[in-house]
Amino acid sequence: VYFGMHKAGKDYRAILVTEELTGFVAMEDRVQDWLEHGAPPRRERLPHLKAVATLLRTMHDHGIQHNCYFPKHVFTRINDDGSVDARVIDLEKSRWRPSRTICAIRDLYTLNHHSLCWSTSDRLWFFKSYLQIGRLTPFAKWLWRLIERRSRRKNRINPPRGRIAAKKD
Protein backbone atom coordinates (compact mmCIF):
# COMPACT_ATOMS: atom_id res chain seq x y z
CA VAL A 1 0.00 0.00 0.00
CA TYR A 2 2.92 2.36 0.75
CA PHE A 3 6.65 2.42 0.02
CA GLY A 4 9.14 5.12 0.91
CA MET A 5 12.92 5.25 0.73
CA HIS A 6 15.68 7.76 1.43
CA LYS A 7 19.46 7.71 1.63
CA ALA A 8 21.00 8.08 5.09
CA GLY A 9 24.76 8.40 4.74
CA LYS A 10 25.96 5.40 2.75
CA ASP A 11 22.84 3.35 3.50
CA TYR A 12 19.29 3.45 2.23
CA ARG A 13 16.36 3.44 4.64
CA ALA A 14 12.98 2.20 3.49
CA ILE A 15 9.50 1.50 4.76
CA LEU A 16 6.98 -0.87 3.24
CA VAL A 17 3.36 -1.05 4.37
CA THR A 18 1.20 -3.84 2.95
CA GLU A 19 -2.36 -5.02 3.27
CA GLU A 20 -3.40 -7.46 5.97
CA LEU A 21 -2.78 -11.12 5.14
CA THR A 22 -6.43 -12.11 5.51
CA GLY A 23 -6.91 -15.85 5.85
CA PHE A 24 -3.18 -16.57 6.11
CA VAL A 25 -1.72 -18.50 9.06
CA ALA A 26 1.94 -18.40 10.10
CA MET A 27 3.68 -21.71 9.43
CA GLU A 28 4.89 -21.60 13.03
CA ASP A 29 1.27 -21.59 14.26
CA ARG A 30 0.17 -24.16 11.70
CA VAL A 31 2.99 -26.55 12.68
CA GLN A 32 2.34 -25.97 16.39
CA ASP A 33 -1.27 -27.02 15.79
CA TRP A 34 -0.01 -30.12 13.98
CA LEU A 35 2.26 -30.94 16.92
CA GLU A 36 -0.57 -30.56 19.43
CA HIS A 37 -3.36 -32.26 17.49
CA GLY A 38 -1.53 -34.54 15.09
CA ALA A 39 -0.48 -33.64 11.59
CA PRO A 40 -2.85 -34.00 8.68
CA PRO A 41 -1.98 -36.62 6.06
CA ARG A 42 1.04 -35.85 3.89
CA ARG A 43 -1.16 -35.02 0.90
CA GLU A 44 -2.55 -32.10 2.96
CA ARG A 45 0.83 -30.99 4.40
CA LEU A 46 2.85 -31.04 1.19
CA PRO A 47 0.93 -28.23 -0.59
CA HIS A 48 1.96 -25.91 2.26
CA LEU A 49 5.59 -26.97 1.97
CA LYS A 50 5.44 -26.62 -1.83
CA ALA A 51 4.04 -23.07 -1.58
CA VAL A 52 6.73 -22.05 0.93
CA ALA A 53 9.48 -23.66 -1.20
CA THR A 54 8.21 -21.96 -4.37
CA LEU A 55 8.07 -18.56 -2.65
CA LEU A 56 11.64 -18.95 -1.37
CA ARG A 57 12.88 -20.18 -4.75
CA THR A 58 11.28 -17.16 -6.48
CA MET A 59 12.97 -14.78 -4.04
CA HIS A 60 16.34 -16.46 -4.59
CA ASP A 61 15.87 -16.49 -8.38
CA HIS A 62 15.69 -12.69 -8.10
CA GLY A 63 18.76 -12.55 -5.82
CA ILE A 64 16.80 -11.69 -2.67
CA GLN A 65 18.02 -13.30 0.55
CA HIS A 66 15.50 -12.92 3.39
CA ASN A 67 18.02 -13.49 6.23
CA CYS A 68 15.25 -14.30 8.76
CA TYR A 69 13.24 -16.99 6.97
CA PHE A 70 11.67 -18.35 10.15
CA PRO A 71 8.34 -20.22 10.15
CA LYS A 72 6.82 -17.26 12.05
CA HIS A 73 7.60 -15.00 9.06
CA VAL A 74 6.06 -17.32 6.45
CA PHE A 75 2.28 -17.50 6.08
CA THR A 76 0.11 -19.88 4.08
CA ARG A 77 -3.55 -19.84 3.11
CA ILE A 78 -5.71 -22.61 1.69
CA ASN A 79 -7.76 -21.23 -1.20
CA ASP A 80 -11.30 -22.30 -2.09
CA ASP A 81 -9.96 -24.49 -4.91
CA GLY A 82 -7.63 -26.32 -2.48
CA SER A 83 -4.45 -24.63 -3.70
CA VAL A 84 -2.13 -23.04 -1.15
CA ASP A 85 -0.64 -19.53 -1.32
CA ALA A 86 2.39 -18.40 0.68
CA ARG A 87 3.50 -14.94 1.75
CA VAL A 88 6.49 -13.69 3.72
CA ILE A 89 6.74 -10.77 6.14
CA ASP A 90 9.56 -8.86 7.84
CA LEU A 91 11.63 -8.06 4.80
CA GLU A 92 13.69 -5.40 6.59
CA LYS A 93 16.78 -7.63 6.77
CA SER A 94 16.47 -8.80 3.16
CA ARG A 95 19.47 -8.22 0.96
CA TRP A 96 20.36 -8.62 -2.68
CA ARG A 97 22.98 -11.30 -3.25
CA PRO A 98 24.75 -12.09 -6.54
CA SER A 99 24.21 -15.84 -6.27
CA ARG A 100 21.17 -18.02 -5.60
CA THR A 101 23.47 -20.45 -3.75
CA ILE A 102 24.53 -17.74 -1.29
CA CYS A 103 20.86 -16.91 -0.71
CA ALA A 104 19.97 -20.59 -0.34
CA ILE A 105 22.63 -21.46 2.21
CA ARG A 106 21.46 -18.83 4.69
CA ASP A 107 17.70 -19.02 4.20
CA LEU A 108 17.45 -22.81 3.90
CA TYR A 109 19.63 -23.24 6.98
CA THR A 110 17.48 -20.79 8.97
CA LEU A 111 14.22 -22.45 7.96
CA ASN A 112 15.64 -25.95 8.46
CA HIS A 113 16.95 -25.15 11.93
CA HIS A 114 13.62 -23.69 13.02
CA SER A 115 11.67 -26.55 11.41
CA LEU A 116 13.35 -29.53 13.02
CA CYS A 117 9.98 -30.64 14.35
CA TRP A 118 9.07 -31.39 10.71
CA SER A 119 9.81 -34.98 9.83
CA THR A 120 13.07 -35.62 7.99
CA SER A 121 11.12 -36.84 4.97
CA ASP A 122 9.03 -33.61 4.91
CA ARG A 123 12.16 -31.47 5.20
CA LEU A 124 13.86 -33.42 2.41
CA TRP A 125 10.72 -33.19 0.26
CA PHE A 126 10.68 -29.40 0.85
CA PHE A 127 14.37 -29.18 -0.07
CA LYS A 128 13.90 -31.10 -3.33
CA SER A 129 10.82 -29.02 -4.11
CA TYR A 130 12.83 -25.83 -3.56
CA LEU A 131 15.56 -27.11 -5.90
CA GLN A 132 12.93 -28.38 -8.38
CA ILE A 133 14.48 -31.84 -8.52
CA GLY A 134 13.14 -35.36 -8.09
CA ARG A 135 16.39 -36.97 -6.94
CA LEU A 136 19.33 -35.48 -5.08
CA THR A 137 22.17 -34.39 -7.34
CA PRO A 138 25.78 -34.09 -6.11
CA PHE A 139 25.24 -30.33 -5.62
CA ALA A 140 21.98 -30.95 -3.74
CA LYS A 141 23.68 -33.52 -1.48
CA TRP A 142 26.47 -31.05 -0.72
CA LEU A 143 23.97 -28.30 0.11
CA TRP A 144 21.76 -30.62 2.22
CA ARG A 145 24.77 -31.84 4.23
CA LEU A 146 25.99 -28.27 4.79
CA ILE A 147 22.57 -27.17 6.04
CA GLU A 148 22.18 -30.25 8.26
CA ARG A 149 25.69 -29.78 9.73
CA ARG A 150 24.93 -26.16 10.62
CA SER A 151 21.60 -27.17 12.15
CA ARG A 152 23.19 -29.94 14.25
CA ARG A 153 25.81 -27.51 15.56
CA LYS A 154 23.10 -25.04 16.54
CA ASN A 155 21.00 -27.84 18.11
CA ARG A 156 23.68 -28.55 20.68
CA ILE A 157 22.82 -25.16 22.17
CA ASN A 158 19.06 -25.12 21.55
CA PRO A 159 17.57 -28.60 20.97
CA PRO A 160 14.26 -28.89 19.04
CA ARG A 161 10.98 -29.91 20.68
CA GLY A 162 8.82 -32.74 19.34
CA ARG A 163 8.32 -34.09 15.83
CA ILE A 164 5.31 -33.97 13.56
CA ALA A 165 3.50 -37.27 13.28
CA ALA A 166 0.39 -37.87 11.22
CA LYS A 167 -2.85 -38.29 13.16
CA LYS A 168 -3.90 -41.83 13.91
CA ASP A 169 -7.44 -42.39 12.63
Task: Locate each region found by the language model.
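Short alpha-helical scaffold element within the canonical Hanks-type protein kinase domain
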Residues: R45-L49
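A short, structure-level motif marking secondary-structure boundaries and short turns
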Residues: A39-R42, N112
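Conserved ATP-binding subdomain of kinase catalytic cores across diverse folds
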Residues: V1-Q32, E36-P40, A51-H62, H66-N67, ...
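Hydrophobic residue at the +6 position relative to the catalytic HRD Asp in the kinase catalytic loop
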Residues: Y69-T76
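Activation-loop N-terminal segment of eukaryotic-like protein kinases
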Residues: T76-S83
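An acidic, Gly/Ser/Thr/Pro-rich helix-cap/linker signature
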Residues: W144-I147, G162-D169
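C-lobe/activation-segment region of protein kinase-like
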Residues: V84-R156
